[in-house]
């Protein structure tokens, strides 16, 4: 009986800690993400569970994250809901990119969140933002080519090295 109780306790604590790793994307979250990476390049990917091309892009970014461990900072923002967090975690894990920081839309008015990110964004995914050192961004909608990401990484790595 004690073994069963311990097993259940471990199962539920693991599940809840996984969900806690997904941050609520609310008004002000975009600024929080940007300020935490001041002076650092990063990639911000908006995706959702129903997206046809998102698995391909997230798997590609996972492979690149292994190759460029120290140089590639990827943040994932799911445009689903907080209720979907367990499924989002499972899906991201299956793509191999579970080490990335994860957020999920947590407002009943998703248009407001999208507007805060980009006034010209109407919710299409995948939508990938490439932020350089000065946080000037390049926005790509649809599947991003691996060569584009590698070229972007090389350009930004050169700038990081010049700065130091």
Stretches with model-predicted labels:
Residues 56-96, 110-113:
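Structural microenvironment flanking redox-active thiols in thiol-disulfide oxidoreductases
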Residues 92-125:
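Short, internal strand/loop/helix patches
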